[in-house]
């Protein structure tokens, strides 16, 4: 009970959410994950000349192959869930369904299945369960919530910019900068904090 009270000081879970609503939200997240997995592999296997010029210039195909967008989507799912357990469940199902869409497309449309990568990403999907549980507290109050949200934004900042000042400060990818800015808006603090 002491631990529960400690965590509820950071952020209290919503208790008045019906089971039907939770199921519908989780099913929607599963569908979104599956569609994004198929889209990511489709765009990965599509020649860049097929894509509109703006998507080619933004390097959208490689963007979905890097970590920043997936960290942001997991963070969004986590912080907008009703409780840390729902955050963990929803994020886990998002990644598992995304991997299902990705590797089903790989196997049945493109005709190959990279098992080593698949196993690695499944292990990461299982780890996302625990990370999302912790991430849910990023929208809470106090020093722990500030620390968690700072870690998330720091990881996304490192995806967007070279932070090694001996090599000079420069931007890696424009879309990662946008992703980082979205995370800053998503996890912004009250002025007093």
Set out the residue ranges of the language-model regions:
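Alpha-helical transmembrane segments of integral membrane proteins
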Residues: 20-32, 85-94, 119, 123, ...
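N-terminal topogenic module of multi-pass integral membrane proteins
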Residues: 1-87, 91
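Membrane-proximal helix-loop-helix units in multi-pass membrane proteins
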Residues: 96-158
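Alpha-helical transmembrane segments of polytopic membrane proteins
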Residues: 57-71, 116-127, 170-182
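Terminal transmembrane helical module of multi-pass membrane proteins
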Residues: 147-193
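Hydrophobic core segments of alpha-helical transmembrane domains
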Residues: 72-77, 128-132, 178-190
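Short juxtamembrane and helix-loop transition motifs at transmembrane-helix boundaries
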Residues: 46-58, 77-86, 104-115, 135-140, ...
